[in-house]
């Protein structure tokens, strides 16, 4: 790891943007409080990047994620298909882990997506959630559950667990870093994976 200037983006294949302040313990639990400062940060970064390249794939991690991704896609005449955010990939991983734990199975066997905006307005399309083909509504018949499954509680816990980590640890790092690495790996290996990212949808 070393410090470099924006000119080094000229031949970059992938650029990951994590800059800007984050929410802190005891502060607001709403990522939108970061909006004004992080919009300025994003504008500055994109102005610098676009001086040197419009070829690299840009992955946005900074919050509020979806708004910053929108700004990066819309404002700088950068190819929109080369900019996206980590989206609800981390929310999805957390949900699958919680559901797997409740059902006594490895999270890798859980298929379920958290969709929408990263944060308080995300949602879960329950009719797509399954464990090795067993649909959500049949989990109570097929698995020895640790507790009764409550859709509202599962969604709520998925939304707030990151904020709870901030209160306990002071920041989040590992989960979102793994999400970014997951996307980078998918791109580099051309995996053709289906993952929930932040992007502007037209049409």
Model-derived regions, located:
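Solvent-exposed alpha-helices and their adjacent loops that cap or buttress functional pockets
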Residues: 7-9, 51-53, 103-106, 187
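General small-molecule cofactor/ligand-binding pocket signal
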Residues: 2-4, 84, 113
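Acidic ATP/Mg2+-coordinating residue in the GHKL
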Residues: 18
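Rossmann-like NAD(P)(H) cofactor-binding subdomain of soluble oxidoreductases
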Residues: 29-96
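Short, internal active-site loops enriched in acidic
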Residues: 7-9, 63-67, 117-119, 202-203
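Conserved N-terminal Rossmann-fold NAD(P) cofactor-binding segment
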Residues: 1-13, 21-28
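C-terminal substrate-binding/catalytic lobe of Rossmann-fold NAD(P)-dependent dehydrogenases
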Residues: 76-82, 91-203
